[in-house]
Amino acid sequence: MDRYLVGKGWEGFCDRLQCASHCIDIALHYNRILCIDWTDRIWSHDDRHFYSYFDLVGVPYVTTVGQIPQQLETFPILWQGDLGRLADEWLYDRKGEIAFDATERNHHQPVWVYPGIGNRYYDFIKLHSQMRFRPEIAAEITRMIADVPTNLPVVHLRGTDRALPDGRWEELLRAAPVAIVVSDDSALVARWLADSPDSMVVSETLAPNLAGNGVGIGTHKTDPLVLKNQGVDKHRLNLRLLADFIIMARAPHAHAINPNSLFFSMSRFFGQCGGVGPIFQAAPKAEKFSTHHRGHHFYFRQSP
């Protein structure tokens, strides 16, 4: 019998990367067909989802939960017959019902669902060989970062860190008097450029009318419908996020208002693990295989 693992997406991009790495390892270890399901209101839009941006290599996969027979017994049971249920804030209210640990040996259901929150392990040294940008995404990001110098430090100015500790701003200016600026907050960018006019801003910044009560909110977590009403294209925003991630990953030095920002720390870690070059490499051609369930199939790209 074919067995499956659904990896839901929630929270920020680097939470998702960690969870994707976790799910890839589980799928390989337990011989399961993987579906990374990022069809939630934070990431997906206009029929675009995880597989619109990334190719998987070396792990069997399907691209939608609709390719999994819905009648199969599922663990946790909350997802039974409802694999397409969107991840959202409700996950935190039902942690006990969605908890998933593959090492618990008493779970033999054909379908497992990892909720996208909670405990996970990740291996970024392997991840860049298991996940690749789709060719059209790689080409677009390459274009977006082509004119960004690689010899300057990067400064990450996250809107949610506006209330920075005393002296932190001055520390950043001393560490990177001229820098590449990655930010989601227009007010922080304006402040930085006032102090460092020769710095280069690469990010589209947070529109002021999306910032509630003077506090920046991550644009990547803003509902695509809200963004659309503000004239912000979600696909462009996702591309910008990926480009910013690569810019920080490849920088010789990088600094942040909050070094504990997961986007900042994981981009640096990804770069240190040698991921920047390989993730741009085209994935091998996917082969299509039939499953034991009539009318169902999965895909597989052989590792080089």
Q: Language-model segments: what does each one mean?
A:
Residues E11, L17, S21, L239-A286:
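A donor-sugar binding/catalytic signature common to diverse glycosyltransferases
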Residues W38, L157, V181-S183, H255-N258:
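Short beta-strand/turn micro-motifs composed of small residues
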Residues D47-G58, L188-D198, M266-F269:
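Short, aromatic/basic amphipathic alpha-helical patches
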Residues M1-V178:
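Secretory-pathway glycan-assembly enzymes, especially type II membrane glycosyltransferases
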Residues I42-D46, R162-P165, D185-W192, E287-S290:
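Short, charged/polar "capping" segments at the starts of alpha-helices
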Residues A282-P304:
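Leloir-type glycosyltransferase catalytic cores
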Residues G218-R236, R240-A243, A254, N258-P259:
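C-terminal structured domain segments
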Residues L157, P177-V232:
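Catalytic donor nucleotide-activated moiety binding site of glycosyltransferases and closely related
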